[in-house]
């Protein structure tokens, strides 16, 4: 039987690097809500006043965890921490239908609502000017 060649150190290092990046995240406060953001992923936030392809920086960072089991918790915010986002698109959420009816009164009211959203891509998470990703 032929033995499999040992894994190359570069491949193992690349896997470890990818795992470290996937383990890093930040919890930020944006538009009255808290979001768990990871680098190189996109998220839908409430509509931001920014043009497409603009860069937005969020300073209200509540928690940062890098891939090396180092967690920084703010009180209430982490000092010197920021998350850089790139605006990809402005879109609208799914339609929600609100139907109100009073029985036996012939009163019916139907309303629809679509939330205005901004799709953003997380460019980097940094603390004290040093990027984690």
UniProtKB/Swiss-Prot annotation:
Signal sequence extent: none
GO cellular component terms, semicolon-separated: cytoplasm; ribonucleoprotein complex; ribosome
Region (Disordered): 1-22
Pfam families given in the database record: Ribosomal_L21p (PF00829)
GO biological process, one term: translation
Keyword terms, alphabetized: Ribonucleoprotein, Ribosomal protein, RNA-binding, rRNA-binding
PROSITE patterns (UniProt xref): RIBOSOMAL_L21
InterPro entries the UniProt entry points to: bL21-like, bL21-like_sf, Ribosomal_bL21, Ribosomal_bL21_CS
Keyword Ribosomal protein annotated: yes
A GO molecular function held by the record: structural constituent of ribosome
Domain of life: Bacteria
Subunit annotation: Part of the 50S ribosomal subunit. Contacts protein L20.
NCBIfam families: L21 (TIGR00061)
Function: This protein binds to 23S rRNA in the presence of protein L20.
Family: Belongs to the bacterial ribosomal protein bL21 family.
Protein name (database record): Large ribosomal subunit protein bL21
Native organism: Prochlorococcus marinus (strain MIT 9303)
